[in-house]
From Swiss-Prot:
This is Protein hedgehog. Belongs to the hedgehog family. A lipid is attached at residue 251 (Cholesterol glycine ester). The record marks 251-252 as: Cleavage. Ca(2+) 2 binds at residues 144, 180, 183, 185. Interacts with shf.
Length: 465
């Protein structure tokens, strides 16, 4: 059987490609006919314009296909961090221990749930921002009888609903129990996110305390910004404010962070240019030099919250919370990619060995946070980059290195096709041409398009929310 006959979009793509080729050929023929009497300079400029038009059409077609294709896959064929497309493999989840918090930071830091914004009362203007949660898979104790325990911020509701589903999967017949959410009676001291609807205390419906360590872990996986196994009687979870600027939208490094060029020179990311070959990493963890093909985000003035990862070898990586960082799993001898704000102390990251030049695991000994000026997100052809000697992905927000790399395929194709353009040298020789790095200020249009479409084609569990 012909493969195209069973895949409708493949036939459509073939027809579109043929149509595109015909248009380019027709355009080329007309251009050739009209240029018989034209000067050599005019013919050269027409050839350049014609080649760029065909290239633009082809790139648009490939980009459209790669955006549409994910919609045709069932979410059941999901992929975990760094495992590529295919069958989902369950990963081991370890329960939290009593008094453990994730992240291991103060609840009110920017890398956790963020600062307090003020008590919300029933007569407060912000009270209308609280939303009721009527999820039938969640039990609400509601001791006050006012329905206050059902009120919470939008983000808290989203995470709680995800957790409720996880609880039913983990323990069939057991439901999530919420013992406290928004509090209007000041039962939690002077400072508490309960007063803002950004915190919940939870347990399981059977009150089995042996489950609470795993319940806390499930809360972390559900996306709560700060989780504490605070007591043997319950778990405490909180989230960032709905009104806060989302620090996880972008995946970037600081401009002062450095990359190693193929020449052996270290260069600040803020000074990198398209075409620079920097130290990167292959899919199997080998060091390799790869070309910078674009900047997914570049803004030297923007203030941003960053996570800082300190290793026992002295390396320090400063990166935004939603950025993927390579993590070595010694038990399974596998390399995975994990969101920076979910890396914990004792996790192992890959760091360049000064003597051998190879990437070796080093243990994370400290996880901190910092607010700094400027963001830079270079994209290499390999999809990875070694920054401050620590191996990291070029991608963020989506918890799969392979899926994100696949999504940027049109940009790699465009870069390759541009290198084949016969007029490339002539165009670049013009004194008016400025490097893309100098021109760009903000998010690259293609990266921005992918970010917007992800909410429609990817399940929430695949995203950093």
């Amino acid at each position: 059987m012909d493969n195209h006959s069973s895949v409708p979009w493949a036939s459509a793509a073939s027809v579109t490609c043929l149509s595109l080729d015909a248009k380019c050929h027709s355009s080329s023929s007309k251009s050739a006919a009209s240029s018989i009497s034209a000067s050599p300079e005019t013919q050269t400029m027409r050839h350049i314009a014609h080649t760029q038009r065909c290239l633009s059409r082809l790139t648009s077609l490939v980009a459209l296909l790669l955006i549409v294709l994910p919609m045709m896959f069932s979410p059941a064929h999901s992929c975990g961090p760094g495992r590529g497309l295919g069958r989902h493999r369950a990963r081991n989840l370890y329960p939290l221990v009593l008094k453990q918090t994730i992240p291991n930071l103060s609840e009110y830091t920017n890398s956790a749930s963020g600062p307090l914004e003020g008590v919300i009362r029933r007569d407060s203007p912000k009270f209308k921002d609280l939303v009721p949660n009527y999820n039938r898979d969640i039990l609400f104790r509601d001791e006050e009888g006012t329905g206050a325990d059902r009120l919470m911020s939008k983000r808290c509701k989203e995470k709680l609903n995800v957790l409720a589903y996880s609880v039913m999967n983990e323990w069939p017949g057991i439901r999530l129990l919420v013992t406290e959410s928004w509090d209007e009676d000041y039962h939690h001291g002077q400072e508490s996110l309960h007063y803002e609807g950004r915190a919940v205390t939870i347990a399981t419906s059977d009150r089995d305390q042996s489950k609470y360590g795993m319940l806390a872990r499930l809360a972390v996986e559900a996306g709560f910004d700060w989780v504490s196994y605070v007591s043997r009687r319950h778990i405490y979870c909180s989230v960032k404010s709905d009104s806060s600027i989302s620090s996880h939208v972008h995946g970037c490094f600081t401009p002062e962070s450095t990359a190693l060029l193929e020449s052996g020179v270290r260069k600040p990311l803020g000074e990198l240019s398209i075409g620079d070959r920097v130290l990167s990493m292959t899919a199997n963890g080998q060091a390799v030099y790869s070309e910078v093909i674009l900047f997914m985000d570049r803004n030297l003035e923007q203030m941003q919250n960053f996570v800082q990862l300190h290793t026992d070898g002295g390396a320090v990586l400063t990166v935004t919370p939603a950025h993927l960082v390579s993590v070595w799993q010694p038990e399974s001898q596998k390399l995975t990619f994990v969101f920076a704000d979910r890396i914990e102390e004792k996790n192992q990251v890959l760091v360049r060995d000064v003597e051998t030049g190879e990437l070796r695991p080093q243990r994370v000994v400290k996880v901190g946070s910092v607010r700094s000026k400027g963001v830079v997100a270079p994209l290499t052809r390999e999809g990875t980059i070694v920054v401050n000697s620590v191996a990291a992905s070029c991608y963020a927000v989506i918890n799969s290195q392979s899926l994100a790399h696949w999504g940027l395929a049109p940009m790699r194709l465009l870069s390759t096709l541009e290198a084949w353009l016969p007029a490339k040298e002539q165009l670049h020789s013009s004194p008016k041409v400025v490097s893309s790095a100098q021109q760009q200020n903000g998010i690259h249009w293609y990266a921005n398009a992918l970010y917007k479409v992800k909410d429609y084609v990817l399940p929430q569990s695949w995203r950093h929310d």
